[in-house]
Amino acid sequence: MKLDLFQMQQCWIQARVFERADKAGYDMTAFVAAFMGSSAAEGLDADYDRMQWAGEAYVLESVVNEAKLVPDAAAQKFDREALFWAGFIYRFWSFKTGEPSRAIHARFPLADVLSVYPGFHTISNDRAVEEMIAIAERRAA
């Protein structure tokens, strides 16, 4: 799937939201679950929504406020590049399939995305999403 410039920008923004959340010290498992089920994610999933024109700082603040998240110094730490890719690939997945963020996260939570990162970040985004969907479908069967 070839994304247009606007869609590609949305993928990069979501990736940077995940990166900023990690830098700010949020528990990323909780943050990603909150993000993927948030009104901000619903806006990014929509055909058109003002959230699509917001920067990553605004999107992050929106999710943090909605979910009432606070930084957690004791939270498990993850590789920041893997988190960046997770944000990117979740948004790409939504564009590719039309699935809402909430449904994607329910099928393939952050732990699963991070577990496939070492091999999947080196293949095309299309193939990575197809493989993640196949894994999720095998697991559900």
Label every model-predicted segment.
Residues 3, 7, 11-63:
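N-terminal interaction modules that seed assembly of large macromolecular complexes
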Residues 26-33, 70-75, 98-105:
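Short, surface-exposed acidic
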Residues 67-70, 88, 109:
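Low-complexity, flexible helical/coil segments
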Residues 112-141:
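Glycine-rich, aromatic-bearing surface loops/beta-hairpins
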Residues 84, 89-106:
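Long protein-protein interaction modules used by eukaryotic assembly/scaffold proteins
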Residues 4-10, 75-84:
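Structural motif
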